[in-house]
């Protein structure tokens, strides 16, 4: 039991870590300075795309030109800013054909990936409460809820990772095929795939914890039920016997037990009050000593022998 609690607390830290990494991913592009400027999805050479900067970085909320380690000429911020060079800079003869012909592919992959990222963070936050309580509370519903929320969070985080990876890896390949430099943002992709790994471990352990917790609770219930079936409890016949043989009185005489169906009842005879003839006969009857009995011819006792003075 101690080992299970230790592992559950350790995996709970994994859940916290996944939530923290996902939160940083959502903040990508929230500011144009500081640490957040290094959390980008793709950096590529966009020179010649109409009025686009020579080097562009794409974030969650906008895209910015990158020169001499600083961001400049950023676009307006908007949630789930789509990755689509055709929409970002307009159509151009220098724009690779894949961005013109497959515009919807890049557009919806980036936007749906953002939505899946938000949903995964929502389920991660929900899983924190039962994940912590499952270590200390014996209720069966808590580990089951923890397991369900963990698998939902894992499903949406891996879906977001696949959508983002598919979108920007395809874009990097398109840029490089056109003779332009392009690279993925190392921090963003490291964070999102690390979150996938942490949530996978969390989901697997929550399933094991829920299954073992349920089996232990079932065994305890069986033991509790067995106590009620213990032979130490008096049976109905024993209770009837003890009640019948009881000598307790209520002040007016002995308590008579209720008759039991199917059991022969003892019969008693009573002598009417004031009738003393029975006791008078007992007084006049004389018991004859055994020494005064005369032996019979057949070895028995013939009867009393009269002794005369």
Swiss-Prot record:
The record places the following residue ranges in the Cytoplasmic compartment, namely 1-5, 138-140, 210-309
Q: Which residues carry this modification: Phosphoserine?
A: 230, 232
Q: What is the lineage of its organism?
A: Eukaryota, Fungi, Dikarya, Ascomycota, Saccharomycotina
Protein name in UniProt:
SUR7 family protein FMP45
Task: Spell out the Low complexity composition-biased ranges.
Answer: 258-274
Give the note. Answer: Present with 329 molecules/cell in log phase SD medium.
Q: List the disulfide bonds.
A: none
Q: What does this protein do, in the record's words?
A: Involved in sporulation and affects the sphingolipid composition of the plasma membrane.
Which Pfam family, an example, fits this chain?
A: SUR7
Q: Lyase: present as a keyword of the record?
A: no
Specify where it is mainly localized. membrane
Which residues get modified to Phosphothreonine?
A: 235
Gene (UniProt): FMP45
Subcellular localization, as worded in the UniProt entry: Cell membrane
Keywords, sorted A to Z = Cell membrane, Glycoprotein, Membrane, Phosphoprotein, Sporulation, Stress response, Transmembrane, Transmembrane helix
Q: Could you confirm whether the keyword Membrane appears in this record? A: yes
* Membrane association type: Multi-pass membrane protein
Expression induction = By osmotic and salt stresses.
The record's Gene Ontology cellular component field reads: cell cortex; cell periphery; membrane raft; mitochondrion; plasma membrane
Q: Which InterPro entries match?
A: SUR7/Rim9-like_fungi (IPR009571)
The Gene Ontology biological process terms listed for this entry are: ascospore formation; cortical actin cytoskeleton organization; endocytosis; fungal-type cell wall organization; septin cytoskeleton organization
Looking at the UniProt entry, the stretches that span the membrane are 6-26, 117-137, 141-161, 189-209
Which family does the record assign? Belongs to the SUR7 family.
- Intervals, Extracellular compartment: 27-116, 162-188
Looking at the record, which segments are called Disordered? Answer: 253-309
Q: Which residues are glycosylated?
A: 73
């Amino acid at each position: 039991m101690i080992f299970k609690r230790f592992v559950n607390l350790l995996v709970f830290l994994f859940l916290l870590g996944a939530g923290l990494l996902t939160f940083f991913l959502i903040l990508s592009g929230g500011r144009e300075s500081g640490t957040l400027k290094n959390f980008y999805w793709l950096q590529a050479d966009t020179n010649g795309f109409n009025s686009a900067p020579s080097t562009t970085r794409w974030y969650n909320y906008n895209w910015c030109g990158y020169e001499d380690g600083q961001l400049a000429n950023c676009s307006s911020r908007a949630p789930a800013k789509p990755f689509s060079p055709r929409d970002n800079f307009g159509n151009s003869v220098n724009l690779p054909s894949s961005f013109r012909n497959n515009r919807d592919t890049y557009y919806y992959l980036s936007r749906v990936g953002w939505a899946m990222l938000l949903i995964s963070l929502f389920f991660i936050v929900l899983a924190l409460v039962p994940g912590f309580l499952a270590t200390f509370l014996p209720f069966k519903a808590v580990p089951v809820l923890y397991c369900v929320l963990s698998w939902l969070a894992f499903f949406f985080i891996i879906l977001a990772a696949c959508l983002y990876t598919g979108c920007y890896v395809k874009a990097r390949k398109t840029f490089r095929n056109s003779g332009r430099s392009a690279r993925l943002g190392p921090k963003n992709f490291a964070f999102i795939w690390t979150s996938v790994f942490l949530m996978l471990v969390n989901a697997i352990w929550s399933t094991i914890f829920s299954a073992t917790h349920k089996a232990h609770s079932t065994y305890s219930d069986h033991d509790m039920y067995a106590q009620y079936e213990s032979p130490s409890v008096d049976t109905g016949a024993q209770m009837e016997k003890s009640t019948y043989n009881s000598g307790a009185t209520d002040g007016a005489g002995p308590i008579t037990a209720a008759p039991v169906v199917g059991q022969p009842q003892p019969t008693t005879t009573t002598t009417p009050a004031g009738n003393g003839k029975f006791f008078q006969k007992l007084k006049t009857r004389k018991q004859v000593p055994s020494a005064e009995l005369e032996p019979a011819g057949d070895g028995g006792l013939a009867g009393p022998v009269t002794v005369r003075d």
